UniProtKB/Swiss-Prot annotation:
Subcellular location: Host cytoplasm
Segments of this protein annotated with the region Interaction with host ZC3H7B: 170-234
Main localization of the protein described in the UniProt heading: host cell
Family membership: Belongs to the rotavirus NSP3 family.
Alphabetized GO MF terms: RNA binding
Subunit-structure text: Homodimer. Interacts (via the coiled-coil region) with host ZC3H7B (via LD motif). Interacts with host EIF4G1.
Coiled coil, from the record: 166-237
Protein name listed in UniProt: Non-structural protein 3
Organism of provenance: Rotavirus A (strain RVA/Cow/United States/WC3/1981/G6P7[5]) (RV-A)
Amino acid sequence: MLKMESTQQMASSIINTSFEAAVVAATSTLELMGIQYDYNEVYTRVKSKFEYVMDDSGVKNNLLGKAATIDQALNGKFGSAARNRNWMADTRTTARLDEDVNKLRMMLSSKGIDQKMRVLNACFSVKRAPGKSSSIIKCTRLMRDKIERGEVEVDDSFVEEKMEVDTIDWKSRYEQLEKRFESLKQRVNEKYTSWVQKAKKVNENMYSLQNVISQQQSQIADLQNYCNKLEVDLQNKISSLVSSVEWYLKSMELPDEIKTDIEQQLNSIDVINPINAIDDFESLIRNIILDYDRIFLMFKGLMRQCNYEYTYE
């Protein structure tokens, strides 16, 4: 049965594309900074670092494993998907994830990235406007959740009394972001649905191709059986022909030496391989014609010695 590994191939393609994007980003940065570089050296170093990070962090194996689970589910095998679902809902998994998060937090603190910086980076992102010196500050999902839970406060100590502050309608902003999120979610779902349909079509084409191959193999087997039957029939016919010639030879009034010579030639015929048998028959017929020619020459010489003439009618 043919296996569909489209998701694994797509995940591998995304990883390779990410590596190529990393190389392009590195070389573009060096060019903008006016730094001369060797492309092969940059390519080798980025590749070494990229492969090490992807392998050491387990990200590559994690992506390929999830892709393999999706392929198995598309092929009707839901065991791996069920195990992953149970694993994600296990309390031990949750505890281990919390432990990993705590380790990452401590690592960031040891690098000088304190809690304030981590929270701000998690709540906001900055988007540069092309051709402008200003920037757009975007709120993340965490910021939206904090607003909903009432965990956002305004410190008036940083605002002067005479300063006019523009009121931001966070509700409308949130509704706009929610609409954008729903629109993006719909587009992603449409693309995923389209990809699943294409994957199913590819799978159907594979099954159809497999059926065609099976039919061709069956036809080849039938032709092989027919060829084997023809070969057996030829072997039987050749064996019967040799036996018939031997019986006819014994009924002739020829000297025993001639009979023995012809019988030896008949026994040397390969009745197993029809091609060799035809070659042996050709050799036998040539020898008979040659003997007949020699007898005729002897008879012709004898007639001349006796002063006789011969004619063909």
